Amino acid sequence: MENGVLLQGFHWYIKPEEKLWKKLKENVDEYKQLGFSALWLPPAYKGVGGKNDNGYGVYDLYDLGEFNQKGSIETKYGTKVDYLACIQAFQKAGIDVYGDIVLNHKMGADGTEIVNAKEVNRQNTNEIISGDEQIKVYTLFTFPGRNKKYSDFIWHWYHFDGIDYDEKTHRNTIFHF
């Protein structure tokens, strides 16, 4: 197709009770008839806010609405089963599907770690404005609700290059590790 038309299949204010994955699937024929050739889906994984998170508050990339984490099993948009059924319906109709994903940050850690860090200038993060200091950071991600299904990887502070909060002093500033 030379000039396809992409449907953004979501907006910021969708409510969890709208069951987006099911709603999109129910309307796939209408979208095909309207001429859409591709569908853009929001992040499908569990965010820090559980079923109230739009997916951009990244918690667990492997939880697509399957595990009881962050207060819910479902994501804001539904379950893993609903998500996969939605994708399959669009693909069967000949509509390409693009899932959004965020890989550059995480939120809602399962624990804290003590690390050495340096404060940097908010306006120029290349400028270090403090010496080494010990801070307490939320960088330990163990995903206990998933119990190592799909991946046993545990995130630690050294998987990140910085953070914006010190639990020890309750300071909101930018630190580099």
Language-model features: where?
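Substrate-binding/active-site clefts of carbohydrate-active enzymes
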Residues: M1-E26, L34-S37, P43-F177
